[in-house]
Design a protein with these regions (language model features):
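Conserved short submotifs of the Hanks-type protein kinase catalytic core
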Residues: 97-110
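A conserved short helix/loop substructure at the end of the activation segment
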Residues: 243-246, 260-272
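Activation segment of protein kinase catalytic domains, centered on the conserved DFG
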Residues: 117-129
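Glycine-rich ATP phosphate-binding loop
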Residues: 24-59
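Catalytic-loop of the protein kinase fold
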Residues: 142-159
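Activation segment/activation loop of eukaryotic-type protein kinase catalytic domains
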Residues: 154-188
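Short beta-strand micro-motifs within the conserved protein kinase catalytic domain, predominantly
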Residues: 87-100
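Conserved catalytic-loop aspartate of Hanks-type protein kinases
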Residues: 205
């Protein structure tokens, strides 16, 4: 694939679409379109023709360091090498302000909007297919020794033509001039170790997948009722996770929980995760349509209750990738770890002389009840409750964008 310089005057019908994190997003029509094939007779590349594209602004590129440019260049090559990643055709520059912009293939809808529009109609077979496509794309990214760093439902995109889900924003998911002591990302999806200041690794991407798996199961973004970033960050580090949705397949649930474990070493690598999702998809593909339809009907009312209750609490400002800077946060832990330590101390002080296991189990039960009251809101009469993740951190460093047509 060729990554090229796209003259700004080759773009028409440029219209503002939205603000995506630190970047302004526009739609446009590329007059010539991408290179599509090689004409052996004419001995030249043939272009696609008029093509709808997305323009994504790159802020403060002039202040970026060499490491940022090297990583961006590497990720551009990955996105154009593999069909599971949204293709970036090249770069252009807005002459009115001098800002550089990525020229990206346009998809039909992102995962967040798709789930909100179709959740009540989705079978588990369809949901697992979404998880399959996402994990397949991430397995390719990780196989190239790359890390995404900002996986969330806003940059998982769907193509109706190909009936496939893609990962987008690879390599350009943060400001070029981000300070080294800050993190960038969509807070509900950021891994706890990254929130607490550690470097981003592939296992941080796996954590993000766990939260996406929960969103696929519920139809709603995780932690959507939170108003305060610091409180959410602290609760994530202390082990708060979303409540598993009723009816979630056990294997899917177990994989999801492994992904969002507080200890990165306990999370599966992407190959193990993909194999698990793939085997689950194979199972559901062998189930008869009658059973799948019955399952969909059974989930319909339950999902309506979940969506109606949670949509009232969604904080739209939370689900934007941005720079975060948290100080003096504790080490990440799973919720049960904290409960065990806390209540063993309490029982010692009370001088209760009974079996230690009974004490700790009793303590856990009390804390779980207290934590539900503290962190969740009730969904129905059966006290089904729903909680809710982020990721990003690495040091940056600049190469100049060349004047030539091919980068």
């Amino acid at each position: 694939m060729i990554i090229e310089w796209v003259p700004y005057n080759n773009l028409q019908n440029i219209e503002y679409l939205t603000k995506g994190g630190i970047s302004e997003i526009y739609t446009a029509v590329w007059i010539d379109g991408r290179y599509e094939e090689w004409d052996s007779k004419e001995q030249k590349l043939i272009r696609y023709g008029r093509q709808e594209v997305i323009l994504k602004g790159l802020e403060n590129v002039e202040n970026a360091n060499q490491r940022w440019f090297e990583e961006a260049e590497s990720h551009l090559k990955i996105s154009n090498k593999w069909p599971q990643i949204v293709q970036c055709f090249g770069l252009t520059q807005n002459p009115s302000n001098g800002n550089y912009m990525l020229v990206i293939d346009r998809a039909d809808i992102d995962l967040r909007k798709y789930l909100q529009e179709t959740q009540n109609q989705l079978s588990w077979k369809e949901r697992i297919k979404i998880a399959h496509d996402i994990t397949l794309a991430l397995s390719i990214i990780h196989s190239e020794s790359a890390i995404h760093r900002d996986l969330h439902s806003g940059n998982i995109l769907y193509s109706k033509l190909n009936q496939r889900w893609y990962i987008s924003d690879l390599g350009f998911c943060g400001p070029a001039d981000k300070l080294t002591d800050s993190i960038y990302g969509n807070l509900p999806y950021i891994a706890p170790e990254v929130i607490s200041g550690k470097n981003t690794t592939k296992k941080a991407d796996i954590y993000s997948i766990g939260m996406l798996m929960w969103e696929i199961s519920s139809g709603q973004p995780p932690f959507s009722y939170y108003e305060n970033d610091y409180n959410l960050a602290l609760n994530i580090i202390n082990g708060m996770r979303p409540k598993v949705i009723s009816g979630t397949p056990l294997k899917y649930e177990n994989l999801m929980k492994q992904c969002w474990d507080a200890d990165p070493s306990n999370r599966p690598d992407i190959d193990t995760l993909f194999d698990g999702i793939y085997s689950l998809l194979q199972y559901y593909q062998n189930i008869s349509n009658e059973i799948l339809q019955q399952e969909t009907n059974n989930n319909l009312e339950n999902n309506k209750i979940i969506n109606n209750s949670m949509s009232k609490h969604i904080n739209s400002t939370l689900f934007t990738s941005k720079i975060h800077k948290f100080k003096n946060l504790p080490e990440p832990k799973n919720a049960i770890e904290g409960m065990s330590r806390k209540f063993s101390k309490v029982f010692k002080k009370l001088n209760i002389k009974s079996n230690n296991d009974i004490q700790i189990n009793y303590g856990k039960e009390i804390v779980e009840q207290q934590q539900i009251r503290q962190y969740n809101f009730n969904i129905d009469d059966e006290d089904e409750t729903y909680d809710y993740k982020n990721f990003h951190s690495e040091e940056d460093n600049v190469f100049e964008i060349p004047d030539g047509k091919i980068i």
